[in-house]
Amino acid sequence: MQDWTPREHYTAEDLVEIIRILRDGENGCPWDKVQTHASIRKNFLEETCEALEAIDADDPVMMQEELGDVLMQVVFHTVIEEERGRFDMEKVCREVCEKLVFRHPNIFASSAAENAGINSWDALKNKEKGRTTLALSLIHISEPTRPLY
């Protein structure tokens, strides 16, 4: 059993620590500690679809819950990678922060000179990745959500 003091306010760091505790090989939750990327892949997709349903419904209570579930999935997958020694939450956050700065040269002066003349998010994304992303080409993003499987 893990000592844990309930808090009035939780942070993203608390969420990471809770997932680490649940996955602890000795004292963790039997279900959580055996999960892999493949075994919880469907959960990630389901939680994402539920978050989109909440957004479509413009329901703030539902959005708060479902966005939390998506965040938990991101942290769960990240902790699996942390256990493998490949990356951790700090690296995930650094990656997305660097990406946002790079793709907003009109806002962040440090990236303005490097990206002068490129004025669209997609063009900056393609420059950054060196390719065009096709992930959303299979999804009708303008339509209300529906199961993808």
What is each PLM-predicted segment?
Residues 1-26:
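Charged, compositionally biased N-terminal leader segments and the immediate start
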Residues 5-12, 34-41, 60-67, 86, ...:
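Amphipathic, non-membrane alpha-helical segments in soluble helical-bundle scaffolds
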Residues 21-50, 54-59:
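Active-site flanking loop/helix segments enriched in acidic
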Residues 44-52, 56-82, 90-97:
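An amphipathic alpha-helical micro-motif enriched in hydrophobic residues
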Residues 113-134:
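N-terminal cationic and glycine-rich segments that engage phosphates or anionic surfaces
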Residues 139-149:
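Single conserved hydrophobic/aromatic residue that forms the stacking wall/gate
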